[in-house]
Amino acid sequence: RFGDIHVAASSKDENFTYIPRKFDIRPDAQYLHICTNNTIFGTRYNFLPKTDVPIVADMSSEILSRVINVSDYAVIYAGAQKNVAPAGVTIVIARKDLVDDKDNQLSCCPTMLKWSVQAANKSLYNTPPCFSMYVAMLVFRHLKKIGGVKAMEEINNKKAALLYDFIDNSKLFKNYVRKEDRSIMNVPFVTGNAELDAKFVKEATEHGLCTLKGHKLVGGMRASIYNAMPVEGIKA
């Protein structure tokens, strides 16, 4: 409905356990869309594809988790529900020329999803989700207090290193994602036995380690260690 989609790269050949390095970008492409962190398979982009095409990034599951160069992107958008606030708020960082380019806006795009409309109304075109925005403010203040996104990234790297090190040295658990492409937000792991996985999830829950069941598409286990998860939670 909104465009002619072409898949420029995929790691389906290895069950999405790595980030592809080769991209087949069509000459007529208007932008390249990437999801920088995959919550289901536990991968993330540690590089940007080399292209002259504007890059649009979905950072819903990792925004504010690490330092990025915003100017590398034409558009960054993110739902707030992972690292910022309760669901209801969406953050959009877009180049001004794209926001102002009314001539190339799709006529089929709903009015409230048009960035030019939202920008002209200072994000108040419709009644905003006030509580979610209030919580976002508190989160932003907290981040500034602890030293900003750089400090948060250091904490997240420490958390992820602790968990991956345990899994890699375990005789029971395994993570199949290539090390250079591992997410620091979502860590999937398995025993290799579905019944044992289910038993682990059940007994972990009984011991206060909750929501470790893997996504329904892949099974196994998954530890989502977003910004709100303290280092102590990993050590537990």
Feature map (PLM): residue ranges:
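PLP-dependent enzyme catalytic core of the Aspartate aminotransferase-like
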Residues: 206, 215-236
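Active-site phosphate-binding strand-loop segment of PLP-dependent enzymes
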Residues: 10-63
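A short linear hydrophobic-aromatic micro-motif
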Residues: 172-176, 208-214
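Conserved PLP-binding catalytic core of the aspartate aminotransferase-like
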Residues: 173-204
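Membrane helical hairpin/interfacial module
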Residues: 1-3
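Active-site C-terminal subdomain of aminotransferase-like
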Residues: 80-165, 178
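Conserved active-site segment immediately N-terminal to the catalytic lysine
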Residues: 56, 70-81
